[in-house]
């Protein structure tokens, strides 16, 4: 009994250390780097989305089952070092946590959706940020990305007991940016400003003169043209010419 009492603190420490080591070793590393889709694919990069190749055949390890969830971790490039895999599904970060944490989980799937084997003719890609209707507080929501990045992603396998395996982080991905129209290079001199002002005034005077000319022409045309009313009548005098008059009868025969 005395021996057991003296060894109990040491035994508890060893068990705690063993549990920590087991948790640290349970996360299997998958030597796969997520890749962007082919450069020939339309919409590969937009202002709020990007497209990945599906990780086909990368989750065939015996420790991974068909019921395990495969998440895509989306992170700011400078937040990958502080990423911590959630221990429970309830602790999964959502897009609403992105500004504070710098990462979230989305596009939940299973390994049955990423089978191995030869590639087929079907287009198999993952479009990140493609769902505009889901709430950013919904677990697994695939909301449009909030800025140009850069972003990095990886796949995380989770079971009911916690995280099981993860892939490598991808390289940095930068989204397209809206082009902003810029003025001509170089400062505008005072002479340029004066010339622009004079041309603007001359254009206004020319338009005013043209408008006045049109109005004057319209009034002049309407005032000089006689317009007969519908009630005016035209009388034509009837007369006979002398050579058309009938000769009178002279005497009886």
Curated annotation (Swiss-Prot):
One of its GO terms (cellular component) is membrane. Glycans are attached at residues 78, 130. The chain crosses the membrane at residues 195-215. Residues 27-194 are extracellular. Residues 1-26 form the signal peptide. Its main location: membrane. It is found in: Membrane. Keywords: Glycoprotein, Membrane, Signal, Transmembrane, Transmembrane helix. Residues 216-253 are cytoplasmic. InterPro entries: Uroplakin-3. It comes from the Eukaryota. It is a single-pass type I membrane protein. Belongs to the uroplakin-3 family. This is Uroplakin-3b-like protein 1. It comes from Bos taurus.
